[in-house]
Amino acid sequence: STNNRLGLQKITNGSKHIDYNLFGTVTGRLTTYPRSFPILTMKKDFRRIIKPHNDWFLSLDYNGAEVRTVLALLNRPQPEEDIHNWNVVNIFNSPEYRNQDIPIDRDDAKVLFFGWLYNPESEVIKSNLYDRDAIISKYYNDDSVNTVFGRNIKVDKRRALSYIVQSTTSDLVLERAIVISKLLENTNSFVSHLVHDEVVIDLADEDRHMVPKIKEVFSNNKLDKFMVNLSAGKNFYNLEELKL
């Protein structure tokens, strides 16, 4: 469409560099400055124009990042399978919950979980496994959230849980990106960009042997070992899942 063409033209005529704003949000989630390449806001199908300097893009993100952060903050074990499927079986189809006729699938579980996480009034999760109050009492006092990364954010109690989880998840990813960047220091590969909870590596072919190590470093964060989704491709749109 004309709109798509104009949008793409605007991107290709603009800055080729990503200029992240580390202080753009109170939680620490990255934003970009107005003149930056719009990596965080561009349409997904425009990503095909983004190609690596080396041979591949390697993308890493956590499977159900914020759900896993909640479990980690409660010192609960991390399921070694897709977290939303795990929630279907262990939360939404558990005896204490099974009070509706419609079976809940993965997509439903995702919607229900985030509805519960961001709405303090929601009683949709009745399991003690996800204990909102325990997280709030540990990381919220004197009208402020205090995260494991030392962030102190003034916020009302209603939004405290979402701030704790968002900020902690964002910092987990940022901190791992820094460690991966150091790991790649004497190679041609480098951290290309971050998109929310995803770290993207510009990978040289000769560094392919490092992929399992990169995955391991990303997985083992400050809180626990999180399950990682791994994919690779020749541009930032066509990324295919890697099983490692």
Predicted regions mapped to residue ranges:
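Non-catalytic nucleic-acid-binding interfaces of large nucleic-acid enzymes and RNP effectors
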Residues: 1-56, 63, 157, 192, ...
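Helical catalytic core of nucleic-acid polymerases
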Residues: 35, 41-160
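Catalytic palm active-site di-aspartate
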Residues: 59-61, 113, 189-204
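Short, flexible loop/turn elements at secondary-structure junctions
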Residues: 62-66, 169, 205
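Hydrophobic alpha-helix feature that most strongly marks membrane-spanning transmembrane helices
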Residues: 93, 117-118, 178-185, 204
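C-terminal polymerase-core module
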Residues: 120-123, 133-165, 202, 206-244
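Surface-exposed, low-hydrophobicity interaction/linker segments
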Residues: 158-159, 163-179
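Active-site palm subdomain of RNA-directed nucleic acid polymerases
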Residues: 172-195, 199
